[in-house]
Amino acid sequence: MALLFLLPLVMQGVSRAEMGTADLGPSSVPTPTNVTIESYNMNPIVYWEYQIMPQVPVFTVEVKNYGVKNSEWIDACINISHHYCNISDHVGDPSNSLWVRVKARVGQKESAYAKSEEFAVCRDGKIGPPKLDIRKEEKQIMIDIFHPSVFVNGDEQEVDYDPETTCYIRVYNVYVRMNGSEIQYKILTQKEDDCDEIQCQLAIPVSSLNSQYCVSAEGVLHVWGVTTEKSKEVCITIFNSSIKGSLWIPVVAALLLFLVLSLVFICFYIKKINPLKEKSIILPKSLISVVRSATLETKPESKYVSLITSYQPFSLEKEVVCEEPLSPATVPGMHTEDNPGKVEHTEELSSITEVVTTEENIPDVVPGSHLTPIERESSSPLSSNQSEPGSIALNSYHSRNCSESDHSRNGFDTDSSCLESHSSLSDSEFPPNNKGEIKTEGQELITVIKAPTSFGYDKPHVLVDLLVDDSGKESLIGYRPTEDSKEFS
């Protein structure tokens, strides 16, 4: 009876166990799809796809290498939520084949494994382009080719070119393009003279100057003839040094010419827009009235005529009036009527005086002067009348008044003393009855000179002796221009 009672309980437990096993079967959780392996620079990565689930699924990736003893599935990634796995750490020989399988787990349920196809890193993977450097040395172009960087067991390193392995770059194809034409060169990595663990080097002779060289390269693997990606072109232009130097000459000349023309144009433009203006001179207040009176005053144009005459020495009672000669003359001695024997008269006193006439008015002579004027008659009609346009009066005269005294001059004893004075004279100073008239002998008109109409500090002048007209009222001192100033008149 007890056995009959226990039998139904055992049957119920077995049925429940079978039902639980059916729930955990492969058909209960979807399997991953499109499991693929991609490798770039020997860095293999597994990718897969999975449908959207209410719960977030997790994945497990296993790798199996071909040719390994006791080859088994090795866990590469466990319980990851993303849809890729890097298996570079679990790859032995890059040239050998490998397989990958992936399963999903949702909650407590797992899916079946999804397997990939056979994959070899060296055969099916991609390798990036090598790096290039180009330079010119003397008459050659040096090309440096650096091995592409790869990942081996998770470490970045250059591609193995050891011939003992089956996955290495055996040769580099170098493409040189010059002036549109392309030439291909090959570099064997097994030659120690050309390559080392880091780079390979190629020397190309320069065939023509003033040309552009563009270089690109790609590597070829030893296994299955797989090629790397082709590098970008690196260009260099070769110039002839002599031609390059000569090209600077016209460039510099053109630049200098442009600068000069620019400066000239700028100066001309500034001068045209902003012409130079005379700066006004600010005078002090004390000079303003003087400048105004000088600019407003009008002066008539003067005319100057010079008359050259000669005369003989003369004497007065107890008084001798001497005139300053114009030209150098030797006066060894003079005597008066009182002392005729004291000094011997060795030479006749001679001088040349000039009559200077002008149209200006004659100023008055300061009264009170005791100087005796000297009068001369002139045969020229220019000096006959004071009111005519040919008459001139100067404001000063130069005379020497001599009186009897014991005085020696120029080495000769004489009883007369001379007083030299400069003063301004007027008509009222000399009464007509007190003036002594002195006649000149041998008056002769030599030349008539028209003096320049203007004098200034820039014109040379010479002081001349006194002149008197027929009336004997004026005693004048004048200036005449020298021979050099006549050229400017």
Swiss-Prot record:
Belongs to the type II cytokine receptor family. Residues 379-391, 415-429 have a biased composition (Low complexity). The modification Phosphoserine is found at S369, S378, S403. Residues 267-489 are cytoplasmic. Residues 349-360 have a biased composition (Polar residues). Its main location: membrane. It is found in: Cell membrane. Residues 329-437 are annotated as: Disordered. It holds the Pfam family Tissue_fac. Monomer. Heterodimer with IFNGR2, to form the IFNG receptor complex. Interacts with JAK1. Interacts (when phosphorylated) with STAT1. Interacts with SOCS1. SUPFAM superfamilies: Fibronectin type III. Disulfide bonds join C77-C85, C122-C167, C195-C200, C214-C235. GO terms for biological process: astrocyte activation; cellular response to virus; cytokine-mediated signaling pathway; defense response to virus; microglial cell activation; negative regulation of amyloid-beta clearance; positive regulation of amyloid-beta formation; positive regulation of gene expression. It comes from the Eukaryota. The chain crosses the membrane at residues 246-266. The gene is IFNGR1. The modification Phosphothreonine is found at T372. This is Interferon gamma receptor 1. Residues 1-17 form the signal peptide. Glycans are attached at N34, N79, N86, N179, N240. Changing C77F: In IMD27A; interferon-gamma-mediated signaling pathway completely abrogated. Changing V63G: In IMD27A; interferon-gamma-mediated signaling pathway severely reduced although not completely abrogated. The keyword Magnesium does not apply. Receptor subunit for interferon gamma/INFG that plays crucial roles in antimicrobial, antiviral, and antitumor responses by activating effector immune cells and enhancing antigen presentation. Associates with transmembrane accessory factor IFNGR2 to form a functional receptor. Upon ligand binding, the intracellular domain of IFNGR1 opens out to allow association of downstream signaling components JAK1 and JAK2. In turn, activated JAK1 phosphorylates IFNGR1 to form a docking site for STAT1. Phosphorylated at Ser/Thr residues. Phosphorylation of Tyr-457 is required for IFNG receptor signal transduction. Influenza virus infection leads to phosphorylation in a CSNK1A1-dependent manner. The modification Phosphotyrosine is found at Y457. GO terms for molecular function: cytokine binding; cytokine receptor activity; type II interferon receptor activity.
